[in-house]
Amino acid sequence: MSAEPELIQSPLSQTITRDGHSLQVDIYRLEEEIDWLLEVVNEEGTSRVWDDRFATDQAALDAAHEAIDEEGIAAFLN
């Protein structure tokens, strides 16, 4: 029986606060995978996970910032 793969959390994962609201940006991958996943979680625990995979954790973080800048933080609060 094989062990489940370890989840690798990027050191770039962070909390972003704007307009009095905080979003947790989680960037992670499975240890045997190359590409990174992006998830943004609001204060209520609701999350948005990107369908796209990212070649680097920096690319994932850039995508999170871009989405927040373009859509506004309110788009993540629902």
Give each language-model segment a name:
Residues E6, Y28, V41, R53-F54:
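Intrinsically disordered, low-complexity regions of eukaryotic proteins
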Residues Y28-R48:
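Short aromatic-glycine-(Arg/Gly/Cys) micro-motifs in beta-strand/loop hairpins
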Residues I16, G20, F54, Q58, ...:
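Solvent-exposed, flexible loop/coil residues
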